[in-house]
Amino acid sequence: MNDPFNDTHETSGPIERDPNGIDPHKPGAKLDAGKVRPSLILSDMARAILAVAEVGTFGANKYTDGGWQYVQDGIKRYRDAMDRHRLLGAIEERDPDSGLLHAAHEAWNALAVLELMLREKEAEVREASHG
């Protein structure tokens, strides 16, 4: 998997470059053209990220910190939870248990599914490369 946070000059992939055309060996150069820009989510969607973090905090307090990662059949079960919150969000705005927005619960579950899928994929790639 590509590491979007890697600031090294790659030689086996696309050549990295400064978005302003500054030579990599000159002061002020930063080889980040074309790299992932986390600020587009963290700054531009700060309210949504905080709402999802509230769901994560609620879950950690109700269960355990990070315990969601060890739920059996997590992808399937978090998908079901995501769908439940989507359906309930059409009927009511807030989850009665947490008092938080169903949309925030839906987003948290979508992120949990995505995280588990990406981890599975990484494990498959690691296994394949180590034979």
PLM-predicted stretches and their roles:
Residues M1-G131:
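Intrinsically disordered, low-complexity regulatory regions
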